[in-house]
């Protein structure tokens, strides 16, 4: 009987040890599926090429939002299927064709493995389906989708050779160039592949502020993120946010903030409510906020504020680009995000807390911040 308390203490100690081990095991498993899943990529290196290729495709789909995570890619694919299976199919075709073209052109294998040779064609495939005037399941569209997807690695390689002189990424410039080229060549009145008609605003929009819906504004936040892929379903946008969250909570936070700032910018310019609800004011600013807020600049309070400024600037610049592009009957796409973010990345400052990441070291926000802090520590310890 005297030994009973001792036995209880031992049992409690064992339970605490098992609980700690369980938590550590849980964190370890979570570490394998979050971030850029580097361990999984290393594990795949000696596996069949088919498995590696599937990983590259899924990473390409997720790289549109700066995420290199195959599970995030699966979630984004699910979101696309919720929105429209035909759009999802065209996006997958574009990603596959672009990745294969990059392999044939002997592009950098590490970039291909990270999905960097697929994401532009993902957008090309989806947006060609979105802007097609033939509706869903117009199977002949697969041919121009494949053809334009082949141009993406060419555009990427050419732009990279120029922008690499300043250590800058190509972003979605290849997508903008490929889609603009296709829509310019076909247009609304093409017999085979007619597209939607884009026209400049020709009258003052009828806006009644009392009709502004708080619920619709709330829904426009995930819709703004969804419009990065051309999707207007709030559930799809929510799935995309979950996909980003899995890889990087900081990137997810900035994606949501960027979409919110786009809504604020739209309201400040008295934009038609339908455009705001449709997410057209949120997607460019969302991308810009992610890019500056921890992706290509190490996250500090200074760069966080800079990301907010860049998001607002991008939203206003997006309105400018929409008006200009409509004159030549083209959509604004993500031109404003690319140009505005490149402008902010070229910013020079003597503030050590505004640190632009070397392009070769960019991974995801949390890892980028660790690199920045380690580099800062080394500079303090050995200033020479």
Curated annotation (Swiss-Prot):
Question: Which GO biological process entries does UniProt record here?
Answer: establishment of localization in cell; urea transmembrane transport; urea transport; water transport
The cysteines covalently paired via disulfide bonds are none
Q: Identify the keywords attached in UniProt to this record, alphabetized.
A: Cell membrane, Glycoprotein, Membrane, Phosphoprotein, Transmembrane, Transmembrane helix, Transport
Tissue specificity, per the record, is:
Expressed in brain, kidney, heart, liver, lung, skeletal muscle, spleen, testis, ureter and urinary bladder (at protein level). Along the gastrointestinal tract, detected in colon, jejunum and stomach (at protein level). In the kidney, expressed in some microvessels of the inner and outer medulla, but not all (at protein level). Not detected in the cortex (at protein level). Detected in the urothelium all along the urinary tract, including the papilla surface, the ureter, the bladder and the urethra (at protein level).
Where in or outside the cell it occurs: the entry states:
Cell membrane; Basolateral cell membrane
Membrane-crossing residue ranges in chain numbering: 61-81, 85-105, 111-131, 138-158, 168-188, 250-270, 276-296, 305-325, 327-347
Q: Which GO terms describe its cellular component?
A: basolateral plasma membrane; membrane; plasma membrane
Q: Hey, where's the site called Important for channel permeability on this chain?
A: 334
What topology in the membrane does the UniProt record assign?
Multi-pass membrane protein
Q: Major place of localization?
A: membrane
Q: How is it modified after translation?
A: N-glycosylated in red blood cells, as well as in most non-erythroid tissues, except in the gastrocnemius muscle and in the gastrointestinal tract, including liver, colon and stomach.
Q: What happens when the gene is disrupted?
A: Mutant mice exhibit grossly normal appearance, activity and behavior. Plasma sodium, potassium, chloride, bicarbonate and creatinine concentrations, as well as hematocrit, are similar to wild type animals. Urea permeability in erythrocytes is 45-fold lower than that from wild-type mice. Daily urine output is 1.5-fold greater and urine osmolarity is lower than in wild-type mice. After 24 hours of water deprivation, plasma urea concentration is 30% higher and urine urea concentration 35% lower in mutant mice than in wild-type animals.
Please state, per the UniProt record, what induces or represses the expression of this protein: Down-regulated by water deprivation in urinary bladder and ureter, but not in kidney medulla, colon, testis nor brain.
Gene Ontology molecular function: urea channel activity; urea transmembrane transporter activity; water transmembrane transporter activity
Known catalytic reactions: urea(in) = urea(out)
Residue positions the entry lists as glycosylated: 206
Q: How does it assemble?
A: Homotrimer; each subunit contains a pore through which urea permeates. Identified in a complex with STOM.
Function recorded in the entry: Mediates the transport of urea driven by a concentration gradient across the cell membranes of erythrocytes and the renal inner medullary collecting duct which is critical to the urinary concentrating mechanism. Facilitates water transport in erythrocytes.
PANTHER family per record: UREA TRANSPORTER, UREA TRANSPORTER 1
UniProt family annotation: Belongs to the urea transporter family.
Write the protein's name: Urea transporter 1
